[in-house]
A protein has these predicted regions:
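Gly/Ser/Thr-rich helix-start
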Residues: 36, 93, 126
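RNA substrate-binding interface of SAM-dependent RNA methyltransferases
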Residues: 44, 100-101, 105-156
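A residue-level signal for conserved active-site and pocket-lining positions in enzyme catalytic cores
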Residues: 35, 95, 154
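Boundary-proximal intrinsically disordered activation/regulatory segments immediately upstream
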Residues: 1-61, 145-146, 151
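Fold-independent oxyanion-binding glycine-rich loops
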Residues: 36, 56, 76-78, 97-99, ...
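Glycine/small-residue-rich loop that forms an oxyanion/phosphate-binding "nest" at active or ligand-binding sites
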Residues: 62, 68-98
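Structural motif
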Residues: 30, 50-52, 72-74, 92-95, ...
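Short secondary-structure boundary/capping segments
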Residues: 22-23, 65-66, 84-87, 103-107
Length: 156
């Protein structure tokens, strides 16, 4: 397992840019996922994530240690994990994942939800989660909406 201890590490700097910048996420086509359950859901729908990152203290967590068993992971110092600022209390597991491309066309035979101008990532995430729970299979985000693959939307 490779360990990252320094804020000057180029990989950490890239993580920080992904965490803070929508422009960086669009440029790289990647986002950050926080937590075992979100990573599991992503992998079930889209395949393996690009990189798994675990906080030093999270190596002792039963759930996380079982999840990473046999997988290549990077170990990030706990203070660096907190520095990313994705959540107040990090879960201990992050993943760098490719953002799936949106479907080119709307399937008119399926339910859809249209969001327009909803800027708050927490609100976008809550609406998308509620719509998914109600069986809505498509979401269209209009101009001015928070990005669907923003870490804050995914966490909501």
């Amino acid at each position: 397992m490779k360990r990252i201890q320094s804020r000057d590490n180029p990989f950490f700097k890239g993580l920080k840019r992904l965490a803070e910048s929508g422009r960086e996420r669009r440029k790289t086509g990647q986002t950050l996922l926080d937590g075992v359950h979100l990573v599991e859901a992503y992998e079930a729908a889209h395949g393996a994530v690009d990189t798994l990152i675990v906080g030093e203290s999270a190596l002792a967590s039963g759930e996380i240690s079982r999840f990473i068993e046999g997988r290549e992971v990077l170990v990030l110092a706990d203070n660096l994990l907190r520095d990313l600022g994705l959540v107040d209390t990090p879960s201990g597991l992050l993943a760098v994942a490719a953002m799936p491309q949106a479907a080119a066309a709307v399937d008119l035979d399926k339910d859809a939800i249209l969001l327009d101008g909803i800027q708050d990532p927490g609100n976008v995430g809550a609406i998308l989660r509620t719509a998914a729970a109600a069986g809505v299979g498509q979401a269209l985000l209009g101009p001015g909406c928070a990005a669907a693959w923003s870490p804050k939307v995914l966490r909501a």
